[in-house]
Amino acid sequence: MDYDIIYIGSGNASWQGARFLRKAGLKILIVEESLYGGACANRGCNSKALLDAPYEIKALADNFEGCGKSGNFEVNWSELMKLKQKRIAGMSIFLDNKFDEYDLDVAHGKGVILDEHTVQVGEDKFTTDKIVLCTGLRPVIPDIPGNEYLHDSTDFLDIAELPKHAIIIGGGFVGMEFASILAEAGLEADVIIRGDMALRHFHQPYVQNIIEILKEKNIRFHFNETVREIIKDDDVEIANPLQKVLNVKDGMNSDDTLRDPESKIDNRAYEDAFTVNCDSGLSLKGDYVIAAMGREANLEGVGLENVGLTYTKSGVKVNGHLQSDVPNIYASGDVADTGIPKLVTVAIHQSKYLAKELLGEADEIVYPVVPAVVYTIPRIATVGVPAYIGEESDEYEVHRIRYGKSYSLELKNDLTAEAKVVVDRDLNIVGAEIYAAEAENVANMFAFIINKKITLEELDDMIYAFPSSSSVCLYKLHNIHYKF
């Protein structure tokens, strides 16, 4: 065999564990057809975090409007994009150097499985004892007329100028996070959602808070709508619509155009304009249409049919050892269908576990409680047992902690910050929902508490850095412990 293990994909699902296998003496090949590092490093989390940061700061500054803030806080998107491109471009180069440092072989091109022990990359064929699929997910593009006009998350995170009026199809992570950026940039957008709720895996009262904030900033929501087609129009003038049919073709006076009476943005002529038609008759116009309808397994053309391995949009079904139905083929990261949230942190956990598994040192994989965050402005986070389960079960109590109203957090004027903490009958914390500007940090704190089974009494014996959102939240847990 040429290699002990071939990884198809170079993201966190592969190299995080591959380096340990190489250190143990195994010969490793990583196959990559695009940039080293995968989606998160190059066209996902990292890009989004950098582009979002100035708007987060702007929102915090706006909290002091009329009580300390002077002047306007403006974000220069083109300059921000230059910074993003510079930073992200360095990521693939950084990993290329790291792969050399770890003594990992790399083949650049699409990896195709020919049989259970052979992978082809271009004209080269490599034999291997085991194969690990780490191909990740790709954006879902609906099979509808005009889908060639759709942009996915990769496009938006590399756009030179923000659209004047975007239409976002989807109300999940991507759709809501992009809507927040557009709202803070003072632009308009329509969000089309197929079901009756956005961010269905997050605490709905907090989601509704976000929706109301976005509505106040010219983001409109259309629920229970299915997009039928997308049409590219001639040069037109687009109003700011909230109507069933918007028709502003040449010859129509702008005064005749139905428009949102609360709109704060004037009509503008767009060089490119698109009409999005829905089954209900809803018709919207904009200059940029984003497909934010989720992601699906990126396995087309990988050759799974050559080994009789099937998959779904959720990926390859694996057992508790991340092993597929073909014994020597494994899956790690987003492409593994495990029922666990598809997050980069989970991919890292799986990759490190798989290194132990392939060395014969592991039992079935065990997942800690996984925190999840949607980076809207403000953030929403969830970890452990959801509040709605706690509210419906006699096994739990749900305590609402409005820590933003504590005097320490008022220094940041984040007055709406709060958490709903789920405790069991023994007063052990088993879950939390957080709504705050710094929700991700508080979620990580709760994840640590839950995973390490730290009791309320033990928390009460600790001393924390103050003032901080976590310290105030923890102090208020004292009231649960002593039933104040």
Residue ranges and their predicted role:
Residues 1-5, 10-16, 23, 216, ...:
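Mid-to-C-terminal Rossmann-like scaffold of FAD/NAD(P)H-dependent oxidoreductases
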Residues 2-3, 19-26, 31-162, 195-199, ...:
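Glycine-rich flavin
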Residues 6-8, 111, 126-136, 169, ...:
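Short hydrophobic core segments
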Residues 9-12, 33-34, 171-172:
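Glycine-rich Rossmann-fold phosphate-binding loop(s) that bind the pyrophosphate
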Residues 45, 135-188, 220, 305-307, ...:
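Glycine-rich dinucleotide-binding loop and its adjacent helix/turn
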Residues 148-163, 269, 283-357:
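FAD-site-proximal beta/loop scaffold in flavoenzymes
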Residues 439-452:
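A short, polar/charged loop-to-alpha-helix boundary motif
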